[in-house]
A protein has these predicted regions:
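Active-site anion/phosphate-binding pocket segments in diverse small-molecule metabolic enzymes
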Residues: 2-31, 35, 42, 78, ...
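Active-site-proximal beta-alpha core segment in soluble small-molecule metabolic enzymes
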Residues: 2-5, 13, 17-28, 41-190, ...
């Protein structure tokens, strides 16, 4: 992929293929999420992995202009990039604070995830509770006493659904575990990812949409969002085919009648999956 543009920009004639990001659709998706959660719940915008490939700096700046005051990233480096464009927002780093990173966390006013009892850095922290995901977090059965020890330091406490898009029963089991473990903590609590938006009782103090912000519906129950990214190119050549003629590797397409086909200057190196052959 050669370039990325906002939807209202236009690439030069020398650009072969590009993506366009619609900020208007990001705003529409954000509004759909806000309608679902109501005014008493905040949005923590997940902008990890370069905002899922949509451009973290552009997306974070735009979301801040839309009133979003909390963000989450996977790494410290991502968080520092986001901090440059949202100087007054809260930023949670999911991978936590490694030894020696404390000065950078404090210098950029970042919040570190804590997911092990023995790793509590001297920075702003949110504790992750393992309510059933089994990946990271203090086990929910042990979380109560641990949170009590850190009560005066906590900026928040959170958990992560394992299968909110498919397994309703297990998701409710996780929510029950999380609520029990965090009762009375006195700080913000959040567990709902994009798929978790389907559970009103999981909205709590904040929700953490990622895919939904970018218009990827995580499940049929959360389908009121629209894709933000469009991949575009120019037609390289138009070709006329007769019935029975083939085109492409392995002759994957054979014309059943006369056809006019467009050849596009896009290939595997641009990210086009070979599995899409004859399925576009």
């Amino acid at each position: 992929m050669e370039s990325g543009y906002l939807e209202n920009e236009r690439p030069g004639s020398n650009v072969r293929t590009w993506v366009e990001i619609s900020l208007e659709r990001i705003a529409t998706n954000l509004e759909a999420i806000r309608r679902r959660i109501g005014k008493g719940t905040d949005v923590i915008a997940v902008v990890k992995a370069n905002a899922y490939g949509h451009g973290a700096s552009v997306v974070a700046r735009f979301l801040r202009d839309q009133g979003v005051t909390s963000f989450a990233t996977a790494t410290l480096e991502e968080a520092i990039e986001v901090r440059c464009v949202v100087p007054d927002a809260q930023i949670l780093v999911f991978s936590g604070c490694d030894s020696g990173q404390e000065p950078r966390f404090r210098g950029h006013n970042l919040t570190a995830a804590v997911f092990e009892r023995g790793r509590v850095p001297d920075v702003k922290i949110e504790v992750e509770v393992d309510s059933g995901m089994g990946r990271l977090g203090v086990p929910h059965a042990q979380a109560g006493s641990f949170l009590a020890q850190l009560r005066n330091r906590l900026a928040g406490v959170y958990s992560h659904f394992a299968s909110a898009d498919a397994d309703v029963e297990f998701s409710r089991f996780q929510l029950k575990n999380f609520l029990s473990a965090t009762s009375g903590v006195g700080c913000r609590r959040h567990i709902a990812n994009s798929a978790g938006l389907r559970f009103p009782d999981a909205h709590l103090d904040a929700v953490r949409p990622g895919l939904a912000l970018y218009g990827i519906a995580p499940c049929p129950a959360v389908s009121d969002v629209r894709p933000v990214l469009s991949w575009k190119t120019r037609i390289l050549s138009l070709r006329h085919m007769s019935a029975g003629e083939s085109v492409g590797y392995n002759r994957t397409y054979i014309a059943s009648s006369p056809r006019v086909i467009a050849v596009l200057p896009v290939g595997y190196a641009d990210g086009y999956n070979r599995a899409f052959s004859n399925k576009a």
